[in-house]
């Protein structure tokens, strides 16, 4: 049975499956054209926080990111050259390489405390580790939750219109 852990400085080089979507490498994809990753980074900069990436560890050779947070992971590693990120890890073992200040998560209140209170996950569970899903944004959620400039909000709305 997996437990959930908050790992404030998870080593990215331990991730064997980053979960990134193919669009990250397609310059003509709407998310690329409208600079979705830039909007994510702008939001993190303005919020002065990075919400955790979801990690599931099956064994030390199978460390999977996602589904929640894979765009954040891609933006932080490829545009900001991060080597460690905050994660919520589901694993049967608390590995030494998780580093310092690891916190075992026992309740949904503890799980939700690691997220921006203005944009809590739409669904979540602590059954056999931690799972959450942010879900697809609506225009109203975008307005309420994205801490970005009006120009970026407009760009993201245009992207949503094109992709929905």
Where are these predicted regions, by residue range?
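Intrinsically disordered, low-complexity N-terminal regions enriched in serine/proline/glycine
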Residues: 4-5, 9, 33-35, 57, ...
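Amphipathic, charge-rich alpha-helical segments that serve as recognition/docking helices
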Residues: 90-164
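General helical structural elements
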Residues: 18, 37, 76, 148, ...
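A short, basic-hydrophobic beta/loop patch
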Residues: 49-111
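Polar low-complexity intrinsically disordered regions enriched in Ser/Thr and small residues
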Residues: 22-25, 41, 69, 102, ...
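Short, structured coil/loop segments at alpha-helix boundaries
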Residues: 28-36, 87-90, 108, 149
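Short alpha-helix boundary/capping and kink motifs at helix termini
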Residues: 1-65, 77-78
């Amino acid at each position: 049975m997996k437990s959930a852990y908050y790992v404030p400085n998870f080593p990215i080089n331990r991730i064997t499956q980053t979960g990134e979507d193919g669009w990250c490498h397609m310059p003509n994809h709407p998310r690329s054209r409208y600079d979705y990753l830039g909007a994510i980074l702008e939001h993190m900069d303005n919020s002065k926080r990075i919400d955790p990436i979801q990690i599931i560890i099956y064994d030390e050779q199978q460390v999977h990111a996602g589904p929640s947070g894979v765009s954040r992971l891609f933006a932080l590693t490829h545009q900001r050259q991060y080597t460690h990120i905050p994660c919520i890890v589901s694993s049967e073992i608390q590995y030494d390489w998780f580093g310092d200040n690891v916190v075992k998560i026992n309740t949904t209140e503890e799980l939700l405390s690691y997220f921006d209170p203005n944009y809590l996950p739409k669904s979540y569970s602590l059954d056999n580790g931690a799972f959450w899903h942010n879900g697809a944004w609506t225009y109203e959620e975008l307005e309420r939750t994205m801490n970005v400039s009006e120009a970026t909000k407009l760009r993201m709305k245009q992207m949503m219109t094109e992709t929905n």
